Each structure stands twice: as structure tokens, then as C-alpha cells.
Amino acid sequence: MHNLRNILFVITLIGQKYGLTSSQNKELCDVTSSTGLLDSIKVMASHVKEQLKDKGTSEVAQPIVSPDPTDCADILLNGYRSSGGYRIWPKSWMTVGTLNVYCDMETDGGGWTVIQRRGNYGNPSDYFYKPWKNYKLGFGNIEKDFWLGNDRIFALTNQRNYMIRFDLKDKENDTRYAIYQDFWIENEDYLYCLHIGNYSGDAGNSFGRHNGHNFSTIDKDHDTHETHCAQTYKGGWWYDRCHESNLNGLYLNGEHNSYADGIEWRAWKGYHYSLPQVEMKIRPVEFNIIGN
């Protein structure tokens, strides 16, 4: 999976360098996926040859700004530095259309594509206690609280290597963060299984336990516990037996008497404190090299 994903990413970079169109890039990715790398190289050579006709070397050597940014890091590199809503074109989403996403252009250099936000936006406390289809397709308002959608998160995280960042805030406005390298999920056929790498940050490692586990919701029990974790803890998440983080749980806004069913990050606040504000966001791992 990773080898194919990396090949598709390199092919797209080459296409951008030589000014290939979106349809030409899509043809390259389709050929690579279906018939192999050799056929893809032949198609790519043909397209590049067409682009080089009647062009001087000085023109070809100029960097080409991608007309179809694939994530918020691309948007930042294209010169847009304000946080807010943007349109992107993930590579594996081309046949479906564009995605509207919220870009965080301020945190740690910017370029983050936000995939989840919780806050006090007037929705019911159980707003995130939804069935599989809602988590599959996404819900909410990207300017407020929302879940981007597991299909979309899959499309994003399988086009290149990403890290994920969790930004957490308590009622006293104290903040913590956690970063995990090499974050990606599998598709629906594989129950959106979670994959993450090494942890860093000051929030404590409350997501690492969920690595390798499938997504569960109120109507789909894919955890490893004898009970139904999503029903018990009132959210959609990569539960195992059951959780050390529950960022899609009930919005309980601080301390609560119930056990572990709020927006929990155990390593920082334990199981009786529901965080009033959290964000989950992703950025390409190589951004730290090419983006700064």
C-alpha cells in the first residue's frame, strides 16, 4: 500500500514540474494502479514530450504552481496564508470532485488540513453520537464543529505520507498538543483501520493505544471488547478495549461524574474531564523539509 502510494505521489510531482494537466495526471495514476509502473513511465514520457515541444529550457526550468492543490500544505506553498475554508483536489478523489476543507495556516508553520473540531457551537452534547454512514460521509460545519468524513480522510492520507496533530484546550485555556508521524487509515472495506507512527508533544500519548484498530460507531461494533465501546462511550472512534482518547464523545464541557464518555484525553485529564475545545489536523511529513 505504501509503495503504491509513494509511486503515485512521485508521479504527480513530476507531472506538476512539467505542467501536465489534471486529466493527464489522473491517467498516469490510473495506469500505475492497474497495469504497473512500466506502462505509467511510457505514458508519462509521452505527455512530457508533448509539453516540451516549442518550449525553451529556461521556461521548463521554472517552478510550476499546482492549479489543483491536494491539501492545505499545497495551498500554503501557493502563497495563501490566512486560515479558513479552501477547496482542494485530493489525488484519489479526482473522479468524485473537490473537497471543501478548513486550513490552519498559523499553528507550527501552518499548512494543516483540519479533519475534526469540537467546541461550544450550540449543538447538542450528543451531536457526534452518530451512525456509521455519518462518519463515513462526514458531518457538521467546517467553520465550527465537524467530522470531515472517513472516506475523505482515507483519500487524503493515502496520497502521500502525513502526520496528525491534536490540539487540546481546557476550560482554563491551558493547551496541550500531540503529534503522531505517518498517520493514515484504510478504506471502508478494511473498516478504516488506523495506522500511526511515533508520538511527540506535551499532552501525553493517549492515541497510540488505538493504532491498528478499526473504526466503530453506535451501529457498527468493530472493537476488541466484549461490550460495544461506541455505545458505552457515546462516540465514533478507533476503539480497542475501549479507549485512552475519545475525542468524538459527548460534549460535557469540563469535569463530569460519568465515566470516560466525554471528549477525553486520559494522559492529560483522566476519564472525568471532557475537553471543551479540540482539533485534529494533518500535514505532509515532508512539509518540514520543503515548506520551511
UniProtKB/Swiss-Prot annotation:
**Gene3D superfamilies for the chain:** Gamma Fibrinogen, chain A, domain 1, Gamma-fibrinogen Carboxyl Terminal Fragment, domain 2
The answer to whether the entry has keyword Transit peptide is no
Coiled-coil stretches: none
- Keywords, ordered alphabetically: Calcium, Disulfide bond, Glycoprotein, Lectin, Metal-binding, Pyrrolidone carboxylic acid, Secreted, Signal
Cellular localization per UniProt: Secreted
An example molecular function term from Gene Ontology annotations: metal ion binding
Against Pfam families, the record matches this protein to: Fibrinogen_C
Mind telling me which PROSITE patterns this protein's record contains? FIBRINOGEN_C_1, FIBRINOGEN_C_2
Q: Which residues carry this modification: Pyrrolidone carboxylic acid?
A: 24
Q: Which cysteines are joined by disulfide bonds?
A: 72-103, 229-242
Its Gene Ontology cellular component terms are: extracellular space
Summarize subunit and interaction data from the UniProt record for this chain: Multimeric. PubMed:10468566 and PubMed:11707569 are in disagreement about the nature of the multimer, PubMed:10468566 finds hexamers and octamers, the results in PubMed:11707569 suggest tetramers.
Protein name, as recorded: Techylectin-5A
